[in-house]
């Protein structure tokens, strides 16, 4: 017997509360899939359960093959805000909205950026080692330093960049913002200094924190040429997306002493290969792309994802969360 229920694929990382928002409706059936499922297995699973009407994605790629396999896709939504793994033009051609979790993980990513700045400034790893290894007497040879009074350059002034600025202003830092899509008035109203020339601003910064999306415009933005513009005492923080920073160029700058250090939550290849050159540098701290995946953020993102799906199925998608509003 054919079911009239809408079939929704959800990744294993979706929270119980979010699942309940979907399953409490008698017109919805959910099918769970692994967060790190391979492309062939995902496509086969979609075909097996077709028609599939909605999908809540984690790290899984989604494009034309998956749309074809689904049969009757109505909405694709991410448990997150990045969508570089989704073929947006393919969705738009089929009039399928792509939705994201709005500001759900923005506080978490902003905290991670600040955490990385503080970890590097306060030399947390080195201080811990001195106590643990009994080299207390050498503590004055590697003094930590303050964020107070330092200059931060934020790249991208969206949901996360604005929150990072707010936190760093509270640390009494001077905050520069480069975002060609935001007005100087908006940036200044937030207590920051707007800069229109990235290359001219880089030599001024003690820290550079990247918060822009990964697009053709931003891929390779921090290459060897741009890294050379930074002060040798400066630090680079990337909690945005891998590929915005050219890792080979970053490694060369760090080894040559042209850059003081870096904090990386994202990488060109994820996971990065074991033994990757950056792994061996003492002035680099890393995290496995978890800046936006705190306990609280997962709950917020999951619930927003469920609401996105319901809004689309009910014919009124939450417009501010739609990446391709031209399909509406």
Located regions from the model:
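An N-terminal-biased, well-structured beta-alpha scaffold segment characteristic
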Residues: 1-99, 203, 223, 229
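Short, conserved active-site loop motifs that form the nucleotide-linked donor/cofactor pocket
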Residues: 28, 192-193, 283-284
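Short beta->alpha connector loops at strand-helix junctions that form conserved
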Residues: 33-34, 79-80, 96-107, 179, ...
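Rossmann-like adenosine-cofactor binding region
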Residues: 47, 63-64, 180-277
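Short, Asp-centered acidic motifs that coordinate Mg2+ and/or phosphate
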Residues: 52-54, 75, 207, 235, ...
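Rossmann-like dinucleotide-binding domain for NAD(H)/NADP(H)
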Residues: 94, 233-328
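Phosphate-binding beta-alpha-beta segment of Rossmann-like dinucleotide-binding domains, i.e.
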Residues: 94-96, 102-151, 163-166, 170, ...
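Glycine-rich Rossmann-fold phosphate-binding loop(s) that bind the pyrophosphate
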Residues: 157-158
């Amino acid at each position: 017997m054919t079911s009239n229920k809408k079939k929704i694929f959800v990744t294993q990382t979706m929270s119980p509360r979010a699942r309940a928002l979907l399953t409490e409706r008698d017109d919805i059936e959910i099918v769970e899939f692994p967060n790190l499922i391979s492309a062939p297995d995902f496509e086969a699973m979609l075909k097996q359960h077709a028609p599939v009407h909605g999908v809540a994605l984690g790290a899984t790629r989604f494009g034309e093959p998956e749309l074809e396999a689904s049969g009757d896709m109505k909405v694709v939504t991410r448990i997150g805000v990045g969508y570089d793994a989704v073929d947006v033009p393919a969705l738009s051609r089929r009039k399928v909205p792509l939705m994201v979790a709005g500001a759900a993980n923005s506080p978490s990513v902003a905290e991670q950026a600040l955490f990385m700045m503080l970890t590097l400034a306060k030399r947390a790893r080195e201080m811990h080692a001195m106590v643990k290894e009994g080299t207390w007497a050498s503590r004055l040879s590697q003094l930590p330093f303050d964020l107070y009074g330092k200059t931060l350059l934020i790249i991208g002034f969206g949901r996360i960049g604005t929150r990072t600025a707010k936190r760093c202003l509270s640390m009494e830092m001077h905050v520069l913002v480069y975002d060609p899509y935001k007005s100087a008035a908006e940036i200044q109203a937030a207590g920051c200094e707007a800069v229109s020339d990235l290359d001219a601003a880089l030599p001024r910064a003690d820290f550079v924190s990247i918060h822009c999306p990964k697009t053709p415009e931003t891929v390779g933005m921090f290459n060897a040429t741009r890294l050379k513009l930074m002060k040798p005492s400066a630090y680079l923080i990337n909690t945005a997306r891998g590929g915005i920073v050219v890792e080979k160029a970053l490694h060369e700058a760090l080894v040559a002493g042209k850059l003081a250090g870096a904090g990386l939550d994202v990488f060109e290849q994820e996971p990065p290969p074991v033994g990757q050159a950056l792994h061996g540098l003492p002035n680099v701290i890393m995290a496995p792309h978890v800046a936006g995946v705190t306990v609280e953020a997962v709950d917020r993102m999951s619930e927003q994802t469920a609401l996105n799906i319901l809004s689309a199925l009910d014919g009124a998608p939450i417009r501010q969360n739609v990446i391709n509003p031209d399909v509406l």
